[in-house]
């Protein structure tokens, strides 16, 4: 499976998370995953909440449309984005 998979109602993203980064950004490919740097620390779910907020903003969807399917407690996550209104350029490249 590639880092980004298109489904009938959205996208599935395989992510590698880098917490406590200097800024929030989609870095690029990291093996077969998409690397995302976030500023939040990996403590008490702060990184997950921050990641959901960041992904929702990037894809212009509500936070409720971003679901962490796998990897709640680790750096390797699988996230589903339901009906994205916009797709960031870093992700568009991987869909082609």
From Swiss-Prot:
Pfam families registered for this protein in UniProt: DUF167
Gene3D superfamilies to which the protein is assigned, alphabetical: YggU-like (3.30.1200.10)
Entries under InterPro entries matching the protein: DUF167, YggU-like_sf
GO cellular component: cytoplasm
Family: Belongs to the UPF0235 family.
NCBIfam families: DUF167 family protein (TIGR00251), PRK05090.1 (NF003466)
The protein's name: UPF0235 protein YPK_0828
Species of the source: Yersinia pseudotuberculosis serotype O:3 (strain YPIII)
């Amino acid at each position: 499976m590639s880092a980004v998979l298109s489904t009938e109602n959205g996208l599935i993203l395989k992510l590698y998370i880098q917490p406590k980064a200097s800024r929030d950004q989609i870095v690029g490919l990291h093996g077969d995953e998409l690397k995302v740097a976030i500023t939040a620390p990996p403590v008490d779910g702060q990184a997950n909440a921050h990641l959901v907020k960041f992904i929702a903003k990037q894809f212009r969807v509500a936070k409720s449309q971003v679901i962490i399917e796998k990897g709640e407690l680790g750096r390797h996550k699988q996230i589903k984005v339901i009906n994205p209104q916009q797709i960031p350029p870093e992700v568009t490249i991987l869909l082609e």
